[in-house]
């Protein structure tokens, strides 16, 4: 399993805390300082490419779900 960069790891912590949701949901649970929305959205897309997340489109909203458990990563 590929080691995550610090920014990606912080995003995954927010995602694991939230469970599943949109970028906006993850931004609310992101540790301070919170990144700009667009930065977090790009990070989430990268995490999806690395197979850490799965996504499902509902209307014009993407819902992301962790593909691996936090314990599995650590």
Predicted regions and their residues:
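Short, cationic-aromatic polyanion-contact patches
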Residues: 4-7, 58-74
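Short beta-strand "wing" residues that participate in macromolecule-binding interfaces
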Residues: 55
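Short helix-capping/hinge SLiMs at alpha-helix to coil transitions
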Residues: 15-19, 68
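Short, hydrophobic-biased segments on the C-terminal half of alpha helices
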Residues: 41-45
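Short acidic, hydrophobic short linear motifs in intrinsically disordered regions
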Residues: 20-30
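Pre-recognition alpha-helix immediately N-terminal to the DNA-recognition helix
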Residues: 9-14
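Glycine-centered, phosphate/nucleic-acid-interacting loop/turn motifs that mediate DNA/RNA or nucleotide
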Residues: 51
